Amino acid sequence: MKLLHLSDLHIGKSLGNFSFLEDQKYVLDQILDIIKVKKIEAVMIAGDIFDTSVASSEALDLYNYFIEKIIFEIKIPVLAISGNHDSAKRLDINKRFYKTNKYYLAGEYTEDVVTLEDENGPIHFFLLPFMSLAKGRILFGEDVSDFTDLYKKALENYSYKDRNVLITHCYATELSESLEKEYNEGQKPLTIGGSDFCDAELFVNFDYVALGHLHSAHYVYDPKIRYSGTFMPYSFDKKDVNKSVTIVDLGKNSLDIEKIPIKLLRKFEVRTGFFDDLISDPASDSYIKFILEDKATIENAMAKFKKKFPNAVLINYASRSVFAMENSEININIENKSTIELFEDFIEYKDKRKLTSEERSVLEDVIGAINEG
């Protein structure tokens, strides 16, 4: 059976004042074409369908458009679950109607197993939506201390007869890995306190595991335990990542994976330089983050940029503060140094220059006034 694995659609997401709905429809239409061309037989959506628990009417309309195209026009089933961004109860509204039209949706956890058949026999899909640890303790007992415990309980009575696919939304990892490295793009942590992580080895008995939650496409522990990632970047730190959707061809005793590249409506760009140079760049409709190297604030910089770059999103000043320097640490020796010497070291570290005599004089006056009380 040829399956399409999607996750983390985040329908209705915005960046600054910019809604991504137009960009998302552009990609969803590509996905509809992929479903037809590749002769997909079922679509899996592993959570975070919407970006917020109370999705806008526009976001609901776009998702309904996508689902209705699949189930009514292409006429293949959809199997979907809620993620930690979704409202499980809202998703479950009209669940019985959806099911009669082969849209199998698990908002709240109910041990849903959906069986589809191909020429090789049945495939059982276990729909295991996101649930909090608090919810897990209600369902499985107070001894659930983390997500590994939760999944052990959820899977302990599962029968692995025939071929089996798990669709779930979690942070699966090899416990030997560095556990923090995947969080980005403003992803919500799954818990406040406690462990967000689940041992991926728990999933090895499934023939395929369709994961959602992490935004980069990759596998964990075994190539059959896989994140599809988002179908478009949702932050500038992912601007250079080539986005894709994942096709899974599950045979009787075989598994083939194919990633299909996605074309974006607009690029994400980070442009660094002086204002006068950047404003001279060719016009673009890309989403742009500007990092200005000017020392002085440029008056109405964003308004000026938007005349040429209508999707300018953000302006940062490279030298405005040390906190604007991403992924760096301050490395200054502070032992046995005066306040003036510390300022000198800091300016040299931050701006790669020496204090001027005028700046030094002002600092001496300020420090003297402070010391005098």
Residues covered by each model-derived region:
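Short, surface-exposed connector motifs at secondary-structure boundaries
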Residues: 71-80, 283-287
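Accessory, non-catalytic peripheral segments of nucleic-acid enzymes
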Residues: 37, 42, 249-373
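N-terminal active-site segment of His-dependent metallophosphoesterases
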Residues: 1-68, 75, 360, 364-365, ...
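Glycine-rich phosphate-binding loop signature in dinucleotide/nucleotide-binding domains
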Residues: 35-39, 74, 118-120, 158-162, ...
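His/Asp/Glu-rich metal-coordinating catalytic cores
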Residues: 55, 79-221
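Divalent metal-coordination and catalytic microenvironments
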Residues: 8, 28, 43, 48, ...
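Catalytic-core regions built around general acid/base machinery
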Residues: 62-74, 195-205
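A conserved active-site cap/scaffold subdomain adjacent to cofactor or substrate pockets
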Residues: 200, 207-264
